[in-house]
Amino acid sequence: MVRLIRSLLWALLMLAGLSAAEAAEPPVLLVAHPGVDTRQLTRDTTRAIFAMRQRTWPDGQAVRVFVLPNDHPVHARFAKEQLAVYPHQLQLAWDRMVFSGTGQAPNRVTTQVEMRERIASTPGALGYLEREYLDDRVQVITMD
């Protein structure tokens, strides 16, 4: 009985530790080219843009979407936390559009530094970064 209680306490401590570790991860923020007039997007609009179903900003300007590789931890966190989808679901949507000829996949970058550089230099660009990679060459877009 004592062993069972110890095992349960150990499991609870491990779960609490995992939750604390996840909470310590920096947030992944939606960022855009500084020339974009939109300052806020809904989750549905953001999801539609990243699924490549919506190709323009609300003001009509073309959106250029940038993403990290599917196996990048920041991409996985952004997809799950901000878009409420799994990375493989996004990939399936992109593949479907490419193979059917109705659209194209987003632009891939390999690092957050490259993401920041490409967003800063591409009019209409949209992507995501952890806070530590932000600078005055990109703007944060809030999501509600």
Residue ranges of each PLM-predicted region?
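N-terminal secretory signal peptides that target proteins for export/translocation
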Residues: M1-L4
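Bacterial N-terminal signal peptides
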Residues: S7-G17
